[in-house]
Structure formats: C-alpha cells, structure tokens
Amino acid sequence: MEKKQIINISIIIPVYKVEAYIERCIKSVATQEGIGSAYNLECILVDDCTPDRSMEIAKETIKQYENIHFICLRHEVNRGCSVARNTGLEYATGEYIMFIDSDDYVLPNCLKSFTDEIIKDPAIDMVIGSTIINNKTDIKERELLKGKESIIHGFLTMKYLITSWNKLVRKECITENKLLFIENIYLQDQPWLYYLASHIDSMLLLPNTTYSYEEAPESASHGVLNPEKAQRYVNSWNTVFEYYLSHRPNSKDFKHNLETDFLLYLQRTHLRAIMLFPYEKKDYNRILRFRDKIMSLALKDGRLIIACFLLLEYKPFIYLFKFKFIRSHYYYMVKTVGRIAHLFDFVHRKN
C-alpha cells in the first residue's frame, strides 16, 4: 500500500499589542482539521517586543496543545511586522509557509483545503483561499493560474487580495529568490507579493472561505493618524511606488502586453494613496509626484486611453470622487478602460 504523503507546514505569526486577539488566533491554528494526518504543523510566534500581555497569553494557550510544534522567538527591540516575518522565515522548517496576522484567525478547514489541493497537484506553488472581510468573501470561483504572465496579470487586476496572509506558499519560492519583506514601511505586503508573483509558475485560487480578516479600529483606513504616522505612510507609499516602477513587467517576455494592466494598477493604487486620509500639503505633493510619473509612462508608451483615464487624478476631475456613485463604480470603470486599452494593444500588435 502506497504511503500517504504528509506535507510539512510552518505558520508564522508576528505578535505585538494583540492581547485581546492572540488566544483566538492560536486556537484557530491549533484546532485545524487534518493536523498529523494530512500535514504536520509548526507554528512560529515572533514576539516583536510587545509591551502588553500578548505573549503571556500566547504561552498559556499553547500549553493546551501537543499536536503542534510551537516556537516562540523574541526581538530585543520593536522592529515591525516585516522584520518579525523575516525572523520567522529564518527558523521555519516546513516545505510550505503561511503568514497569519495575530488579530485575525483561520477557519477550521483552512490548511486541509490547501494541502488537499497540493497533494492532488504538487506543481502548485501557492494556494489562496477566500477571505471574510466585512461579512463578504473575495474569491467566488476556483481558478488555476499557470505561468508568470497569468499570475502577474492576476496580481495587477486584483483577482486576489494583495496581502501576505491566507496564502500557502512553497518555501523554496521564497528562499531561493531571497524574498524578504521590506523593513520600516507600512504596506509591506504589496512589493513582497508582487515579487513573489513574478517568481512562481502555478497558483490556485479557491472559493473555500479559509480566513477571517479583522480590521483594527486604529488602522489607516479609519483616518486616525498622528503626524509621525502620516509621514511614515508617505514614505511607505513612496517606497512602494519606486519598487513598482523599478520592477516593471517585461512585456517582451509574454504573449500579451502587461503594460496596460501595470499602469492601471499603479493608477488605482495611487488613487487610494491620495484619498485614504488627509495629508499635510508637503506630504500630499510628494505623493502627487508619482501621479505625474505614471502619466509620463503612459504618454511615453503611447497609451492615450490610459492617459485620458489618468486625468481623473488631476483637478478638477479628482473632485468627482466626492460623489458616492463614482467611488462605488470606479472598479467597473477600471475594468472597462482596461478592456478598451487592451483592444488597442491588440490592434497595434496586428499592425
């Protein structure tokens, strides 16, 4: 009788100021279906010098479970989520990696759903499940993306959430490409996932609901920012945009031109940056410089459809986003513009 394949998984959880949530998070991991039969599990908790009782609660909680190998690591000083994840990666022994934010939790079927798919198709480099956000889920149908072109296209068109969590990733894809999170910035998931998408060959999107995202009341989307945080967000956006601009997809490598998707993604990301919360004038102007860089790229490449759409970020058109109708239909506007722009790409290639 053929021996059943057992997959080894490492889960990495940064811990900082989450005493109200950490027990729930750990229990959701420890009570996963299939531990020991479908896969072996280690869980790495990285204490990022948390000042509250988070680690005390975590250590009490893990005593209840012997079916998982828990590793507790500690930073001597607070270094941020990026470094905590990088630290976890150093110690991870699993063939596959999953990141979980400590104020979130995974549903009971999460890891078994992922590993069942990998056992059926070992070529899959990453499995992504559907996430509950505000009582809604994001992935509606199963889809296997094969080849870098399809995977990068999926990123740029946001077929899946631009996050590091709720994704089971082959560890080799991370370590062989020296893929670490950028330190000292917010939004660190964006460049990390973009680079990862450029270095894997097979990705599976699952409609199975596997992860619950809990938005913290103090998060940026609620507009609660002191001057220091605002400055850090501006620096973070600048880092992210510079990263994207220096890692443009080489369209010569693909059958279809990804430049249209790339420019529309930049425009959508930039619009979110300038509308997320009010900045001081000097910070706002720093972010606007990237709007002009995106416009320059579009014009230089002769993408007039994209350039016209980018005018929405300039006065007086930017004021249209004060209307709820425009905001709620913006996603569909992007898709429509993308289709039209791709049609012109096709005509151009034919000629």
Question: Could you say what each language-model-derived stretch is?
Answer:
Residues 7-10, 42, 191:
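Cell-envelope/extracellular polymer assembly enzymes that use nucleotide-activated donors
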